[in-house]
């Protein structure tokens, strides 16, 4: 429920918004989260038109771990090998573009997150699985499978480097994307536009996000 304000502001921009719920680690693995997202996407496909939506213009927006999750689910949708490695059946709801806010894209770096998270996300023996190579979000197959993406971070976002590095991977692959990086401001912390959606800068984030998404 914490993102209700952010979702409401997107609604005011003319979007039909569904807020997806999914199970959380350590009660499940990331593959279970993929299944939850795809189940929600199937629900959207079945109900969006009767709810007043347009299935020819579908977008996914996520922050922090949610941004990571929709990055992977989008790639899984568009690459059968990744789907098979994950052991999931993707939704066939076409996603036109992504909005990635302060994404926690990297889960296995040699840092505070990567030191403990992988075994909970992927299982203790994940290095011996076919999904192992996709744990790195810069995997060329994964990058190539992504829809156009709008990314935002800020100087005071503790995961800023994740967005900066991931954007460079998109740039190297010549993938359609746009990056917004807010300057130093103690109010503009991790995923500020979701946690504090009524800040002026949060309004600017939503305006820029909407402008980008509507191109696709």
Model features per residue range: what roles?
Residues 1-216:
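Alpha/beta-hydrolase superfamily serine-hydrolase fold, recognizing
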